[in-house]
């Protein structure tokens, strides 16, 4: 639940340079984390911006998603929340209803809400929050636009050079190899503390 930064400006010195490199390379998406900063953390700034934000999970945190990631770092892609953040691990916003939480996530800068124990989120909750005026129109427009753009840029629609049957055959042929490679890379990336 808690994210600890005991060293002053540790985020600027150690954690955020990797994210800045990803942003500079125009990465399509970044996943926010479920944890929240401890209230007793050392002072944290990035490029002069105070990021000693609210003690809520990043998916609910406008200071981190909007002010830091988008406005200061220049991120233009979509923000995908961590899984289960809406119902089971809503750190810092436990007192809010799921309806209030989903509205807060969109208004804070989240664009895609992660799954719930492997099941897709029922977006009727977002529609209800929007119809009740809980989600700002610009937040929903931003999230929808970023979702559609990411799908279109992934070359999945209306490509006159792509035949559906050829694409499905290629996917069937390469999916097992890609899955094996992804598992191998994930295994090699683990760090034992």
Q: Residues of each region from the PLM?
A:
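Glycoside hydrolase catalytic-domain context in secreted enzymes
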Residues: 1-193
């Amino acid at each position: 639940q808690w994210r600890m930064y005991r060293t002053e400006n540790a985020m600027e010195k150690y954690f955020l340079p990797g994210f800045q490199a990803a942003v500079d390379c125009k990465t399509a998406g970044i996943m926010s984390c479920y944890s929240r900063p401890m209230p007793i953390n050392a002072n944290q700034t990035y490029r002069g911006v105070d990021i000693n934000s609210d003690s809520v999970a990043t998916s609910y945190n406008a200071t981190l998603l909007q002010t830091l990631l988008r406005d200061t770092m220049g991120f233009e892609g979509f923000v995908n929340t961590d899984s289960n953040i809406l119902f089971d691990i809503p750190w810092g916003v436990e007192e809010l209803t799921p309806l209030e939480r989903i509205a807060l996530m969109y208004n804070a800068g989240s664009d895609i809400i992660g799954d719930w124990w492997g099941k897709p989120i029922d977006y009727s909750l977002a529609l209800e929050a929007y119809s009740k005026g809980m989600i700002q129109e610009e937040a929903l427009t931003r999230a929808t636009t970023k979702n559609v753009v990411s799908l279109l840029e992934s070359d999945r629609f209306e490509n006159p050079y792509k035949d559906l049957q050829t694409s499905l055959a290629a996917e069937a042929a390469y999916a097992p190899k890609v899955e094996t490679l992804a598992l191998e890379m994930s295994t090699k990336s683990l760090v034992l503390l």
